[in-house]
Amino acid sequence: YAPLGWYGTNYVGLRGRMAILSEAYSHADFEKRIRVTHDFVAEILEYVAAHADDVRRIEREADRQTTLEGAGLAPRPELAVAYESASRGTEPVPLVVMRANPDTTARRRAIPTDTVRTFVLPIYDHFRATKTRGLPAGYYLPPSERAIADLLRLHGLLVERLDVDWSDSVQVFGVKEEKWADRPFQGHKLLALTGDYAPAVMRTLPAGTYFVPTAQPLGRLVFSLLEPEGYGLPRWNVFDRLLGADFGAYSGLVYGSTAVAEFPVWRAVRAPRAPRTALP
């Protein structure tokens, strides 16, 4: 399994809600998998029903804490944009000894024996960040990108539009390399961007610019979807038409910048104090 937000269990967690993955591995026969899955899910539902008040309290606190962090009323955390698997150490693990299936035409090439042996093995049970970025106050999208704003709304995110021109400090991501995957994954050649943020600069944001605040219960999801180095919308080609030869030119055209190779979503140092209207 992977820590990426596009997997359903992880996505629910990014929304500040609890999720548990249920999987029945294929080494068990079909009947056993069905029975074990039923019992596992029933046990979870019974536990949640018995602890419903605690679950609601924890999730409400997650909403509150995330909103405070985005607003700068609590320390803004460093959040992961890249990960690696990590081990809690080695432990003795009892394993059933398998033997070769004498039926070479069978689907299962190994079958279990009655022998159990214990091996000391590393237990990889979590992920750790290999690269982090600080949570910003929000993200600015070009006024022309209504389709992207609508996509964010489909995720339930608060998206606002500036009613007037506004000048403020922003962080701009300078792209050093764009690398598309050689093979498609679910119909997409995933895009990896590498680069860095320049020190905050003053930029003028025209009326109509979209602002997506992190001061909302789904603030972590905002970060996950819009950080250029992560596994969100940039990775899934949502910004591809703004990249390539016209990348810098487009960014400059929209925002009046003379810089090149700028990712066209800017990080807000603080929420704009300009009048703005929330999208329906």
Give a label for each model feature.
Residues T9-N10, L14-R17, Y124, D165, ...:
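Surface-exposed loop/turn and secondary-structure junction residues enriched for glycine/proline
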Residues P142-S144, T214-P217:
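Short, flexible beta-strand-to-coil junctions
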